[in-house]
Amino acid sequence: MDAPLVNESVEFQESQESLSLLEASKQLDLKKIQNLVDQGAVTSAIDIESGKNALHFIASYAEKETEVQAIEVTKWILSNGGVWNGIDRANETPGCIARRRNLLRLYETIVDAGVRSELLLSLLERKELTNEQLDTNEKYLQSALSYTQPTEDSSSLLDSDANAVMMSWERKIMHRSAEIIAPTKGRRVLNVGFGLGIIDTFLQEKEPSLHVIIEPHPDVLKHMRKNGWMDRENVIVYETTWENAINDIASKYVFDGIYYDAFAESYEDLRNFFDSVVGLLDPETDSKFSFFNGLGADNQTFYDVYKKLVPIDLVSFGLQCTYESMPVSSKDEEWKGAKRRYWDVSKYFLPIVTFDF
């Protein structure tokens, strides 16, 4: 599941006032920064050589004894156009630097700013599904997928651009997720996105009374047929997108457990699915919903922003979210053949979503 966060800073030949603002940021000099902004400096300016903006420099030069001062300056810059998620030449956000330097209160200030920013951004974008996202989904469904084996004991599913759709190192996550949404045998379960079939295999071990799978990609469906999934007892496969299947499913079934792991979809798509969860979960049982929480997982700051954002969004649907943390790791050789790593954090936060009553 894709979850890009905007991380652009203004990059051009900065004015002298803006360059002076960057220097003042190193000194945590709020009054000087305010005066420079009055003179035309922009808080989103970056140092061309390092790629750092004012918030990067604050996080780099603040110390424990000046952290309160750094937070004050950071809040002012953020409220006056500062970029919380700019990435420097070292591939770090201001939050990454603060966290690395153990300035945890400053880090939380930046993360909270990210949450507010993403809430506002999602409200603006929610008015219409962009053509770009529709094109991304369509491109994925038309691309050729390949099942690969990077190492003797690992497997991957890659798209035609070598993007990893699913990898076997996720097995530990999927096993625990299956235990959460189907703690006992005989449950009614729904999974969106088959991939390598990891969680569906674990769910089958629970002998569900109903097991609905939504999978739109023709290559994955071919793989499922080859391995007999269409013929399994109590398994129903919808060979389409969840958006196309959801009304029919909702008219026929309710579930004790739901899992979502759709590839080539954005956070906004996931948020739209939250609305469907309300009508699909059985309110009369201890029903639970979960999803693969890879939101922003190529960067710790982004991951923590989404960790806070999801529960806030779920409240509006009458749902509540808690997290169960678990260490995860993957070997470098397991990523062989994949274009980029979509996972670069050491701890997984497994979302457990229930009705808020």
Swiss-Prot record:
SUPFAM superfamilies named in the record: Ankyrin repeat (SSF48403), S-adenosyl-L-methionine-dependent methyltransferases (SSF53335)
GO biological process: methylation
Binding site for S-adenosyl-L-methionine: Y140, M174, F194, G195, L196, G197, I198, I199, E215, P216, H217, W242, E243, D261
Family matches, as Gene3D superfamilies: Ankyrin repeat-containing domain, Vaccinia Virus protein VP39
Enzyme Commission number(s) from the entry: 2.1.1.-
An example molecular function term from Gene Ontology annotations: protein arginine N5-methyltransferase activity
GO cellular component: cytoplasm; cytosol; nucleus
Record keywords, A-Z: Cytoplasm, Methyltransferase, Nucleus, S-adenosyl-L-methionine, Transferase
Domain RMT2: 130-357
Top-rank lineage group of the source organism: Eukaryota
Free-text function comment from the UniProt entry: S-adenosyl-L-methionine-dependent protein-arginine N-methyltransferase that methylates the delta-nitrogen atom of arginine residues to form N5-methylarginine (type IV) in target proteins. Monomethylates ribosomal protein L12.
Subunit (UniProt): Monomer.
Family per record: Belongs to the class I-like SAM-binding methyltransferase superfamily. RMT2 methyltransferase family.
Record-given protein name: Protein arginine N-methyltransferase 2
Organism: Schizosaccharomyces pombe (strain 972 / ATCC 24843)
Gene: rmt2
